[in-house]
A protein has these predicted regions:
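Protein kinase glycine-rich loop
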Residues: 19-25, 30
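AlphaC helix of the eukaryotic protein kinase fold
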Residues: 48-70
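Activation-segment/catalytic-loop signature of the eukaryotic protein kinase fold
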Residues: 82
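Conserved short submotifs of the Hanks-type protein kinase catalytic core
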Residues: 86-100, 104
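Activation segment signature within eukaryotic-like protein kinase domains
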Residues: 119-120
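Protein kinase catalytic-loop region centered on the HRD/HxD motif
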Residues: 125-135
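Structural helix C-cap motif within protein kinase domains
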Residues: 210-214
Length: 324
């Protein structure tokens, strides 16, 4: 690993003692640190030297800090502090004890329908809250969603949030946003919106239950063209057991025309909630039975909710165990 701006045991701004290097990305290093004031472990994200030299990247980092710091929701990674150290901007986030959905997908291949619905319900809650506070995430994908050991999801990386006028393909085929999850209108140069976030949620839902994205190719331009021109694939081709109620939600999210998608995340969340309140409908052989036993739902609802929460906990623990 290349040299970083902070060393193990170094103390940033007389408060954050570096414990370990948690990871690194294209823009920043992420450190595990101990807050000497609160006596809690935190994550410190600091821009790379080459990244900090670029004014656009600095602006993005500042926007991420402002956007995320303005949000206080149980399903959003909380920003605790921001500052500058040795000339490099940093932000302090809550430390997430878990793994990204992408990491779990790489190990398990896909999630069960019940697990995926629970995750999507929580994600809709987070995005709905962000939208209500004027923040468009613009980079929703499994890599930016953490699953904690208690089954709670945490949405992070608001690095391009609210960059509503910069959604275009550049000359070097790069995009502001991840092209596999990018709504067709964004690649055509239109502004980001709640509906473009909903499109990305739908793509993520598809990936959770199939283990792959619906459109992929050799270049960003090719993939963007597929989102724009090609018919959305039949989900059951990749997972034949997909219940109609789940497929219907994904198809509505991923309509080419934003007007034909869910008007907001609350509508999508309500559809998912119907499934979670009666998870038997996820199994085709039980759907007819469950239709005639609706009176039992209120009595069994608490048990069912506990079951799908335990399923998520099991998924997180299994993924952690297999990575060791």
């Amino acid at each position: 690993m290349e040299d970083t701006q902070a060393a193990i045991n170094e103390i940033i701004d007389d408060r954050y003692k570096i414990v370990d290097i948690a990871g690194e990305g294209g823009m920043a290093f992420v450190y595990k640190a101990h807050d000497l004031v609160t006596d809690k472990d935190v994550a410190v994200k600091m821009l790379r030297p080459e990244t900090a030299a670029n004014k656009t990247n600095l602006y993005r980092f500042e926007r991420e800090a402002r956007a995320a710091a303005s949000l206080n929701h149980q399903n959003i990674v909380k920003v605790l502090n921001v500052g500058t150290y040795k000339g490099f901007p940093y932000m302090v986030n809550e430390l997430i004890n878990g793994q990204t959905l992408k990491q779990i997908l790489d190990i398990r291949g896909k999630f069960s329908f019940l697990e995926a619905c629970d995750i999507m319900y929580q994600l809709c809650s987070a995005i709905m809250y962000a939208h209500q506070h004027g923040v468009i995430h613009r980079d929703i994908k499994p890599q930016n969603i953490f699953l904690t050991q208690d089954g709670t999801i945490k949405l992070g990386d608001f690095g391009i949030a609210t960059f509503q006028n910069s959604a275009h393909i550049t000359q070097n085929n790069s995009m502001l946003g991840t092209v596999q999850y990018l709504a067709p209108e964004i690649s055509r140069g239109q502004n980001a919106s709640e509906q473009s976030d909903i499109y990305a949620i739908g793509i993520t839902f598809f990936e959770l239950i199939t283990g792959r994205v619906p459109f992929d190719g050799d270049t960003a331009l090719v993939i963007a063209a597929m989102h724009t021109k090609e018919k959305f694939p039949n989900i059951k081709k990749f997972n034949p057991r997909t219940p109609d109620c789940v497929a219907k939600i994904i198809y509505r999210c991923c309509q080419k025309d934003p007007v034909e998608r869910y008007p907001d995340c609350e509508y999508m969340r309500k559809d998912i909630e119907k499934i979670l309140k009666n998870p038997a409908i996820l199994e085709k052989n039980k759907s007819f039975f469950s239709f005639f036993h609706r009176d039992d739902q209120s009595r069994d609802q608490r048990r069912q909710e506990k079951e799908h929460r335990n399923a998520l906990k099991k998924a997180a623990k299994e993924a952690k165990k297999e990575r060791k």
